[in-house]
Amino acid sequence: MWNNHGGFDGGYGGSGMGGGGGYMQSPGGFGSPAPTQGEKKSRSRSQQIVPCTVSQLLSATQNDEVFRIGEAELSQVTIVGIVRHAEKAPTNILYKVDDMTAAPMDVRQWVDTDEASCENMVVPPGSYVKVAGHLRSFQNKKSVVAFKIAPVEDMNEFVSHMLEVVHAHMAMNSQGAPSGGGSTVALSTPGRVGDSGRAFSGGNDNPTNGLTPHQSQILSLIKSCKGNEGMAFEELKNRLHGMNVNTIRQAVEFLSNEGHIYSTIDDEHYKCTDGD
C-alpha cells in the first residue's frame, strides 16, 4: 500500500509495518522495548496500519492508551480526504482533513526545524491527501499525528481506500470476536454528491479515468444536477467553497473542451453529456 508514492509497504494484513521482530521502531523514530509473548499476542494488531474513516476514528473508544473500534485495537491508521484548512507553526503543521463521513479531523504533522525538506511543505487547502499516522486524544478531542502525508492524484485511490476500510475492519473483528458471536463495526462512507452536496461521490458512475481529482469532483457535481438548465457556475462555487475559483473555472473549461459537459441557457450553466 502506497508503494507508488514511495511511502510504506505495510498496511493491514501480513506483517503490518514490516516489523516482525521483538522491537518495533515507529515511523516517528520512537520505539518500545520488546514485549513479552503474551503482550505480542494481545497487542499485535495495534502494530498494523489500519485504513479508517474519520467517523470511525471520532467514535473509537479509549481505555488507558488503547483505542478500539468495536473489538479491533488500533493505533496507526490511514485516512483519505480533502484538506479544508492548513495552519503552519514553527514546529508543526495543523491540517483539517475532511472525508465527508464526519466533521473534519485534526491532523498534526511535526516538521524538522533544522532543514528545509519536502516534509515541511504545507499542503494547500482543496488538495486531496492520504494520511498515515497515530491516533491520539487530548482533552477528549481526537486527532491524528501524521508521519506521512501524500497527495492523491487519482480519485480511484479514494475508492480503493474505502474498500480497504471494509476489508480491514471485517477481518480484524472476525479475529477479535468471541466464539459464538461477532462484533459489527458501522462503516460510515461518504454520500453521493447529489444527496449531500459534498465532494466525493464514490460509485460506478464516477468517471475518474484520465481526470484529476478536482475535475472528477466538478464533473460529478454537474452530473448530479438533473434540471434542464444544468448547474450554474455560481452554484459550483458555493458547493466547492474550499476550492479556488480559478481552479474551478479551469476544470470547467477542460471538461467542456473534452466533451464531458456542455453549456445550456448561457455560458454559466452546464450539463453532463452522459447525465441522462
Swiss-Prot record:
GO molecular function term, any single one: single-stranded DNA binding
Annotated Gly residues bias: 19-31
Principal place of residence: nucleus
Cellular component GO terms held in the UniProt record: chromatin; chromosome, telomeric region; DNA replication factor A complex; nucleus; PML body; site of double-strand break
SUPFAM superfamilies in the record: Nucleic acid-binding proteins, Winged helix' DNA-binding domain
Subcellular location: Nucleus; Nucleus, PML body
InterPro entries listed in its UniProt record: NA-bd_OB-fold, RFA2-like, Rfa2/RPA32, RPA_C, WH-like_DNA-bd_sf, WH_DNA-bd_sf
Chain residues forming the annotated DNA-binding region: 77-151
Record note on what altering S26A does: Not phosphorylated but normally recruited to chromatin and able to stimulate replication checkpoint signaling upon replication fork stalling
UniProt entry tagged with the keyword Phosphoprotein: yes
Gene3D superfamilies, per database record: Nucleic acid-binding proteins, Winged helix-like DNA-binding domain superfamily/Winged helix DNA-binding domain
Subunit structure: Component of the replication protein A complex (RPA/RP-A), a heterotrimeric complex composed of RPA1, RPA2 and RPA3.
Family of the protein in this entry: Belongs to the replication factor A protein 2 family.
Function noted in UniProt: As part of the heterotrimeric replication protein A complex (RPA/RP-A), binds and stabilizes single-stranded DNA intermediates, that form during DNA replication or upon DNA stress. It prevents their reannealing and in parallel, recruits and activates different proteins and complexes involved in DNA metabolism. Thereby, it plays an essential role both in DNA replication and the cellular response to DNA damage.
Record-given protein name: Replication protein A 32 kDa subunit-A
Species of the source: Xenopus laevis
Gene name of this polypeptide: rpa2-a
